[in-house]
C-alpha cells in the first residue's frame, strides 16, 4: 500500500487557505473518494508526489503537456527568456513567431489574438460573434464545457431545445436566457432551435470532440451539419479547440474532421504548460477586435514572453509524423484497456480521438452527456483508487479523458495495461 501522509497533511492545511483546499474543483478528488495527491515534480511521462510515489501520468496538467513534463527544449528556452524579463506590457517578437505557427497550422485562422486562458478565449469569441452579427443568443451543447464565463455555465431544462438555466449560483437568469442548450450529436435539435430562435442566434459554440463528459467524438455528419446550419442562418460557427487544438491532429480537430469554423478558440497545448489562450478566425471577423475594430478585449499579461516561448517551443517539436506515432500509441492503450475489461466481463465503452481516450463503465454507446451519465461512478472511483495504487495517475473524474504525450513509451503503455488488468481483476466481483 502506498503512503500518502504528506499529501493528507498538505490538504488539511490547504482547506484553511483556499476554497475546498484547491484552486480548481476537480483537483479535490471528491468524485473518487480519496485525498488529493500533492505533486512535487515531473519528468517525461512520470510525476512524483510529495510522499515520493511515482506515477505514469495521463493527466498531463489536463492536456497541455503534449511532450510530457519538463521537456528539455521548453525548459531551456524558458530559462533564457526569464533572465531577460518575464513581461513588458509591450509587444515582443516571440508573439509574432507563435502567431505565425498557429496561422500556418489551423485552417480557420487568418488572424489570432493571444489571451491568458481558455475561458478568456471563449468569452472573447462570444463577444466577437455577438458584436459581428448584431445578435444576442448563443447555442451550446449539454455537457460541453467552455470555461466558466456566465453565458457558458448553463445547463438544459426540459424539452428538445431550451433556454438555459444557470448551472451555478451567481449566474443571472437574464444571462442564461440568451443561451440555448441542446444535446451533443443531435443535429435535429439544432435545426429545431434555429427554427425557434434563428434570427437572434449569433453563433454555435462546440467542441469538435467533447472533452468534459469524458471523450465523446462527433457522430458522422454532425460537424458538417453544424457548418451547414450556421451558413444557412447567418450565424457563426465557433470551434472550442482548447482541448483538441494540436492534441488530436497537426491541424487540430478541424483538420482531423475536415470542417472549418468561422472562429477557433485555443489553449492548453499552445502554452506548453503555462497559462495561455487564443482565439482567431477569418480576417474579416477578427479585424472587428480592438484596436482595429470596435469590439473590446484586453489583458495585462496577454502574449507574455514566457507563455509565448513555451508555446512556440512546444509546437515546433510537433510534426505530422508526431501524430502518426500518437495514433499508434493510443490504439495500443485503447486495445489493452478494452481487452482487460472484456476479460473480466466489466461493462465498458471506450471512445478515442487521436491521443484522447475515455473509458466509461457502462453498456451504453456514449455519444452524448446523458449516455455518459449512465456510467457506474462507484466502480470508476474504485478503479481510480486501485490504479493509483498500481502507479498510474488518471484524471480523477469519470467525465475527463486520458492524454498521451510524446514522452510516453511503449513500456509505459504496457505497464498501464498491466495495472488496469490487476485493478479490474480485483474489482470484477
UniProtKB/Swiss-Prot annotation:
PROSITE patterns xrefs: AA_TRANSFER_CLASS_3
E.C. designation(s): 5.4.3.8
Gene3D superfamilies assigned: Aspartate Aminotransferase, domain 1 (3.90.1150.10), Type I PLP-dependent aspartate aminotransferase-like (Major domain) (3.40.640.10)
Highest taxon in the source lineage: Bacteria
Catalytic activity: (S)-4-amino-5-oxopentanoate = 5-aminolevulinate
One matching Pfam family: Aminotran_3
One of the GO biological process terms: protoporphyrinogen IX biosynthetic process
Pathway(s) this gene product operates in, as recorded in its UniProt entry: Porphyrin-containing compound metabolism; protoporphyrin-IX biosynthesis; 5-aminolevulinate from L-glutamyl-tRNA(Glu): step 2/2
Protein name per its UniProtKB record: Glutamate-1-semialdehyde 2,1-aminomutase 2
Organism whose genome encodes this protein: Bacillus mycoides (strain KBAB4)
Lineage: Bacteria, Bacillati, Bacillota, Bacilli, Bacillales
